[in-house]
Amino acid sequence: MKLKKMNLPYISNTYDVRKIMFLVVLSCIPGLCTEIYFFGCGVLIQTLLFVIISLLFEIIILKMRRKNIKNSLFDYSSFLTAVLLGLSTPCALPWWMIIFSCFFAIVISKYLYGGLGQNIFNPAMIGYVVLLISFPVHMTAWNEKNSSLSFYNDIKKSINLILFYNKLNNSKKKICPDNFTEATPLDDFKTKSHFDYDFFPEESAVKKKTKIVSIAWKYINISFLIGGCFLLYKKVICWRIPLSFLSSLIFFSSITYFYSQKFFCSPLFHLFSGGTMMCAFFIATDPVTTSCTKIGKIFFGLIIGFLVWIIRNYSDYPDGIAFSVLFANMIVPLMDAYLKTSGYGHKNL
């Protein structure tokens, strides 16, 4: 019998970095399938393009740094970043925007700080925020799937939009009901809350399409909730961050909702709109950019939930997931410094 030599401490760990990243990517499949069902095959094509470009950027950086490409490339960290970017951005973005986002996510946010384990900001959220600030019109265009198209025609149309032509390239867009239908439920509610009358009262088609998009986001969030429960069951992520984030969002949204149901969304609406569930289980739980302590993880989730509530209600951005996560990433070193625990047998300071 051949014995395996091990160093102290003798603690078995069933999950390495590669397996953790693989399980997280696997848990994204329900959300990916749901987005494809509601928004078309452009989601899949765009996600694959994000993956290919991200891996190419990583290969270039590893070559420049003379690192082992096989070990670094197949830890699935950049693969996961690309998948999260593909799922969080509207489908049919132009190819050059995808390259722009991947450059900031992989080169700037990850390898400029030293690579995996050294970055202080979530790479996927950096890539998302860069697109949101630079191209806000494209980032709010969530078009529903054309049910009249076949599977082949849907793929062909998506490839043409991404690689050759994009209908949003026109700098001048007229304000019409067709533009309104591209809004997410959070966009829709924020627009209507500024008016005392019904926006486009006679446009029944607009209301119908807006309702379809609202239903789509509910099922998308439920799909990510299922994937998140799988990660909790496999003990890949810690329960403290999702629980504290969702509890904070429910608490603050309940206060404003009971104050005025006309101008503020209900807690249930906040939970199943935008990227709430994706943030709770897939983005905020990034082990590199979150706090190392148990109490720090709770504060981390509470801060994100509070900031999401603030941005959704009082800013021009309909969803504040990315900005909230990045701001919380900034204060993680401060939390780890003041919330660190002492060693065994010593009193906490």
From Swiss-Prot:
InterPro entries: NqrB/RnfD, RnfD_bac. The modification FMN phosphoryl threonine is found at residue 184. GO terms for biological process: electron transport chain; transmembrane transport. Keywords: Cell inner membrane, Cell membrane, Electron transport, Flavoprotein, FMN, Membrane, Phosphoprotein, Translocase, Transmembrane, Transmembrane helix, Transport. It comes from the Bacteria. Its main location: membrane. GO terms for cellular component: plasma membrane. It is found in: Cell inner membrane. Pfam families: NQR2_RnfD_RnfE (PF03116). The chain crosses the membrane at residues 20-40, 42-62, 83-105, 120-140, 212-232, 236-256, 263-283, 291-311, 319-339. Its EC number is 7.-.-.-. It is a multi-pass membrane protein. NCBIfam families: rnfD. Belongs to the NqrB/RnfD family. The complex is composed of six subunits: RnfA, RnfB, RnfC, RnfD, RnfE and RnfG. Part of a membrane-bound complex that couples electron transfer with translocation of ions across the membrane. This is Ion-translocating oxidoreductase complex subunit D. It comes from Buchnera aphidicola subsp. Schizaphis graminum (strain Sg).
